[in-house]
Amino acid sequence: MTTITITRPDDWHVHLRDGDVLKDTVRDISRYMGRAIIMPNLIPPVIDTESALSYRERIIAQGPQGNFSPLMVIYLTDNTSAEEIHKAKASGHVYAAKLYPAGATTNSDSGVTSIDHIRPALQAMQEAGMQLLIHGEVTAHDIDIFDREKVFLETVLAPIVEQFPNLRMVLEHITTADAVEFVTNAGPNVGATITAHHLMFNRNHMLVGGIRPHFYCLPILKRNIHQDALVKAATSGNPKFFLGTDSAPHAQGRKESACGCAGSYTAHAAIELYAEVFEAADALDKLEAFSSFNGPDFYNLPRNTDTITLKKESWNVPETMAFGGDEVVPIRAGEAMLWKVI
C-alpha cells in the first residue's frame, strides 16, 4: 500500500503552551488535525471558564490552518466548585476538566491533593455530561516512578469509577499493560488515549547507550512488554482507545540539561508516526478508527467529514524547529519518516 486516505484525524490531548511559542505550536497541530483537546497546565493554570475562553482566543488569533477547532479544558484544583463546572459546560467551548495529581507532571503543582476535595466537582461533571481527563499517576515519594500508573489504577481510579459510574473519563497517555487491562474491562464510560511515542519507544530507547533526554516524558517510558500491550490495544479496533499525542514541547536547553523537563514533541509528524506503528503491526486498516472515529465517538461529537491522504514517501525530520525565540528538538529529529501527508 503506497497511499492511505482517512477521515481527518483529531488530537485528544495536546500541549500548545502560551505566549510567543503559540504561533509555532498552533501551526503544527492545525496542519491536518481537525480538532484538539488543549491541555490547561499553563502558568498560571487555566482553572476557570474565563481563563479557558481567553486562552482559546489567543489560540485562534494565531490563524490556525483549515477549520481547526481548539477544544478547551479547565484544570481541576482542590477549590474547583460545582458552579464553575456548570458554567464551563454552558460556555459551549469547554469540553472537559483535567485531573492532575499535585506534582505529577509539568506545571501540576496547583493540582488536586486529594480526590475528597473534588467530589462536588466530579458530581457536577457527571450531571453535566462533562468529560474527566486523568493524568493517572500517584505522586508519593515512596512509589517507584515506573509503578506510579499501576498504583494509581488500584488506589485512585478504581474508586472514582465505582463512585461515579456515569462520569465519562479518559485515562490519558496510558503506558502500561495494567492500564490497557483496566480500560478494557471497565464500563463504557472509561476510555484512554495513547501517544505515538509510547507506541514507538520503550525505556531502553531512552537509557541504553546514553541518556536521550528528548524521550523523557511523564508518564515515563516503560519496558517493552508494556509497549507491546499498548500497540495491541491501539491496533485492536477497540473503540475505547484513541489518538492523543501528548505532544509537549520544551525549548532545547530545557530538555538538554542537568535537570531536564518532561515532554516529547510529536505534533510536527503525529499521524505519520502513528502510521508507522500501525503499518509495522500490519494494521493500517485500523488507523482511521483509532485516529478519526473513536475519539469523537467517545466525546459524543460528530466525526470530521473531510479527509487527508498519506503517501509512502521518505522525508527527513528537521534537527530543530522554531519554538518562539528558541528551538525545540522534535521526536525523530534528523531521521527519515516513512509516511508523508500530501
UniProtKB/Swiss-Prot annotation:
EC number: 3.5.2.3
Known partners and oligomeric status: Homodimer.
Descriptive protein name: Dihydroorotase
Signal peptide: none
Active-site residues, as the UniProt record annotates them: D246
Function recorded in the entry: Catalyzes the reversible cyclization of carbamoyl aspartate to dihydroorotate.
Cross-referenced InterPro entries: Amidohydro-rel, DHOdimr, Dihydroorotase_CS, Metal_Hydrolase
Record GO biological process: 'de novo' pyrimidine nucleobase biosynthetic process; 'de novo' UMP biosynthetic process
Cofactor, how bound (note): Binds 2 Zn(2+) ions per subunit.
Species the sequence originates in: Photobacterium profundum (strain SS9)
Sites where the protein binds substrate: H15, L16, R17, N41, H135, L218, H250, A262
Pathway(s) per entry: Pyrimidine metabolism; UMP biosynthesis via de novo pathway; (S)-dihydroorotate from bicarbonate: step 3/3
GO cellular component: cytosol
Domain of life (superkingdom): Bacteria
Enzyme kind, highest EC tier: hydrolase
Sites where the protein binds Zn(2+) 2: K98, H135, H173
Binding site for Zn(2+) 1: H13, H15, K98, D246
